[in-house]
Amino acid sequence: MDKKKILLLSDDLRMSSGVGTMSKEFVLGTLKHYDWVQIGGAIKHPDEGKIINMNDSIRKELGVKDANLTIYPVSGYGSQQLLREVMSREKPDAILHYTDPRFWGWLYEMEHEIRQEIPIYYYNIWDDWPAPHYNENFYESCDLIMNISKQTVAIVKEVAKKKPRTDWDCTYLPHGIDEKQFYPIDKFGDEYKNVEGMRKQLTDNNIEFIVFYNNRNIRRKLPGDVVLAFKHFCDQLPKEEADKCCLLMHTQPRDQNGTDLPVVAKTIAPDYKVYFSDQKLTTQQLNYLYNMSDVTINMAS
């Protein structure tokens, strides 16, 4: 039987954003079962206007002989015109969009047109109260809502009063990771030498406890609050123990969408060690960072 084709609207799965990373995970993880087309967004996409056929590379990488993935890069989130063109060319069996529905106003303005032909699915990561009742019309326009957490399921059911959701069209589908890429590294194995090498490169020999932050330097990710929280943590320790702790921030130290983190650290935590990892890393290198860290902190809203 021919595989169904899904049209994904989200961050370009080749990008390193959280949405892009998870888009890549569930697309590559299901290529045995579905063909995929993506309208892949970025702030200013360098490939805008191109059509990227990924078949050869993913078939070689995954060993799936009939894997099919095509990406239509776009700056921003796309448009009605682009969607109509892609639907006409690719003839998908369903549309799946991933991230805040308020970014997809143009999509929901044409939902009556789309749903005469194919369903709209929404992968929902809204997991914080109070319930966003202003999303009710968006939820009503989705044939299936897949939710990142059980709390997200509860939020959707609280919001969707005009069209109550059922267990069939409002499901729990949590994030996952590829355990072949992210895994604990045996401290007595040869690979751990790479972890120690990265530790020496990014911190100093006196460090015994690492607090790890892996997010963009933007206001929503609260990097300044993380520095302040680390300062309060160290304040509660004897000086000799605090001197052995560090905050390792894998982010751009300075970003026009965020703040000047070296200045923030020097101003509010001058007595403590804050280090930065600002180079683009491979998945393997990122796994080394997680293995060398004692705790990961994420205060993002």
Locate each region found by the language model:
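A conserved, positively charged/aromatic
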Residues: R115, Y122, A131-N147
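Conserved donor-binding/catalytic core segment of Leloir-type glycosyltransferases
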Residues: L8, D204-K221, V227-F230, L247-L248
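Nucleotide-sugar donor-binding and catalytic loop/hinge architecture
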Residues: M1-K4, R165, P184-I210, L237-A242
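Nucleotide-activated donor-binding/catalytic signature segment of Leloir-type glycosyltransferases, i.e.
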Residues: T70, M249-P253, G258-Y288
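Carbohydrate-associated surface elements
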Residues: Q151, G176
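Short His-centered aromatic/hydrophobic patch
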Residues: H97-F103
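N-terminal subdomain of nucleotide-sugar transferases
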Residues: M1-D56, E90
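Acidic donor-binding loop of glycosyltransferase active sites
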Residues: Y288-S301
